[in-house]
């Protein structure tokens, strides 16, 4: 089997070599993740590490932690807050035992999951903007607002896609830019509980629904983790979606 193709000037992987490299990296990552989780399990006082995006699902997270702490035999849950899109990596590499992820933005491939909460999205605007007087908007109304571009978040490799919007790394930075009239943002409707004076939200009729899920490695046999997932599923809530073609009622 040939893994490399060599010439006088170049060395390139064959298809077999590319597969071996990809699978080898995955195997090494899995070993490293297993080592981290094994070391945590061997500690004198067992515990769980739960990772969540900073500024997201805070109310749900608080309810989950309080409900689990009241369970007989509950262990300590360390909360690891991270930037957007980082939860998946921290769960895969073993630095976390369980994660709160958000479909369709986070990949849940390879994880066991349970749905916890489904909600619509809103546009966050600086207070006083003309569109804040509208009862509802559509994505076409907000994707190219003059002077209020949507933000650009970093990819998993830390780089930003080209575009007119400001580069942001966290919600605090984003909300300040919106307050200053430099950006707008489409976010889950639960963001309303975190907004300060100077910001207003308007529901979006046709924005994709966001589903918060609790995710964990499929091979886990941890009883504390199973108990945490059981408690989490008991908190499941669902907001009925607004039909994309629905028009706002006079009472809204």
Q: Predicted segment positions?
A:
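A short LG(V/I)-centered, amphipathic sequence patch enriched
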Residues: 1-13
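Hydrophobic residues within well-ordered alpha-helices
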Residues: 14-17, 90-92, 142, 176-181, ...
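Short amphipathic alpha-helical coupling segments at ligand-binding clamshell hinges
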Residues: 16-23, 60, 64, 138, ...
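N-terminal winged-helix
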Residues: 29, 33-37, 42-90
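Short beta-strand-centered segments that line the small-molecule binding cleft or hinge
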Residues: 63-67, 84-121, 198-202
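Short helices/loops that flank or line small-molecule/ion binding pockets
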Residues: 69, 80, 85-96, 171-182
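Short beta-strand and adjacent tight-turn residues that come in two discontinuous sequence segments
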Residues: 82, 96-102, 168-169, 186-188
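C-terminal regulatory
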Residues: 106, 110-182, 191-209, 238-252
């Amino acid at each position: 089997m040939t893994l490399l193709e060599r010439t006088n000037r170049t060395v390139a992987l064959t298809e077999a070599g590319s597969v071996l490299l990809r699978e080898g990296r995955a195997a090494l990552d899995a070993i490293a993740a297993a080592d981290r989780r094994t070391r945590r399990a061997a500690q004198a006082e067992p515990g769980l590490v739960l990772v969540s995006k900073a500024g997201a699902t805070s109310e749900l997270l608080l309810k989950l932690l309080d409900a689990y702490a009241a369970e007989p035999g509950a262990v300590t849950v360390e909360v690891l807050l991270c930037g957007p899109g980082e939860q998946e990596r921290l769960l895969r590499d073993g630095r976390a035992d369980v994660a709160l992820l958000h479909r369709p933005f986070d990949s849940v491939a390879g994880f066991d999951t349970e749905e916890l909460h489904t909600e619509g999205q809103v546009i966050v605007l600086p207070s006083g903007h003309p569109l804040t007087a509208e009862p509802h908007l559509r994505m076409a109304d907000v994707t190219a607002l003059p002077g209020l571009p949507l933000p650009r978040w970093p990819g998993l490799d830390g780089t930003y896609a080209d575009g007119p919007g400001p580069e942001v790394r966290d919600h605090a930075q984003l909300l300040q830019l919106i307050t200053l009239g430099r950006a707008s943002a489409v976010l889950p409707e639960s963001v309303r509980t975190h907004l300060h004076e100077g910001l207003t939200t308007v529901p979006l009729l046709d924005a994709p629904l966001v589903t918060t899920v609790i995710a964990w490695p499929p091979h886990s046999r941890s009883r504390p983790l199973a108990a945490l997932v059981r408690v989490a599923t008991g908190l499941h809530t669902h907001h009925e979606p607004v039909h994309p073609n629905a028009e706002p009622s006079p009472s809204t």
